[in-house]
Amino acid sequence: MLLEGSCHCGAVRFRVVSPHPYPFNRCYCSICRKTAGGGGYAINLSGDADTLVVHGAEHTSIYQAEIDGLTSPGERHFCSRCASALWVFDPRWPELVHPFASAIDSDLPRPPERVHLMLENKPDWVEIESREQDRCFAGYPDESIAEWHARLGLEEG
């Protein structure tokens, strides 16, 4: 599926092909929550890094979080004009890019189940909107974004 996204002010527009377009993964870690999660969580999708096309790249900046005193290799791209979170790239998985669902303008499919992860970092004010079929994890689940899509038969060609 072709995902098209943008920042709030329109200075940055991008597109990327994603075989895994379902916005199912709700991350409650402090990094996602504070950089992109207005509801107490952020939703990352998965795309093919080789297909990422960015217009207005001169208006992007990168934030790399510190975790336990070490700089994370994950590069969180955001608009330097309006601060919209756009995507995450991690050189440990150079074939992937993870756009934030909040930056996607394309219609996304509704997931049949959701995964709530990093719940050990969730603040008390955040209420989990969990459905019966949803899965909840204190940390990271063992299943990747691609594996979740494959298990449910939702991979796109």
Curated annotation (Swiss-Prot):
Keyword Zinc: yes
InterPro entries: CENP-V/GFA, Mss4-like_sf
Chain sites annotated for binding Zn(2+) 1: 7, 9, 79, 82
Annotated positions binding Zn(2+) 2: 27, 29, 32
Gene3D superfamilies, per the entry: 2.170.150.70
Residues of the CENP-V/GFA domain: 3-134
Recorded family membership: Belongs to the Gfa family.
Described function: Catalyzes the condensation of formaldehyde and glutathione to S-hydroxymethylglutathione.
Source organism per UniProt: Halomonas elongata (strain ATCC 33173 / DSM 2581 / NBRC 15536 / NCIMB 2198 / 1H9)
Top EC class of this enzyme: lyase
Name of the protein this chain belongs to: Putative glutathione-dependent formaldehyde-activating enzyme
Any Pfam family hit: GFA
GO BP annotations, alphabetical order: formaldehyde catabolic process
Co-factor remark: Binds 2 Zn(2+) ions per subunit.
Superkingdom of the organism of origin: Bacteria
Keywords assigned: Lyase, Metal-binding, Zinc
EC numbers, comma separated: 4.4.1.22
One GO MF term: metal ion binding
Keyword Repeat applies: no
Necessary cofactors: Zn(2+)
Reactions this protein catalyses: S-(hydroxymethyl)glutathione = glutathione + formaldehyde
Pathway where it operates: One-carbon metabolism; formaldehyde degradation; formate from formaldehyde (glutathione route): step 1/3
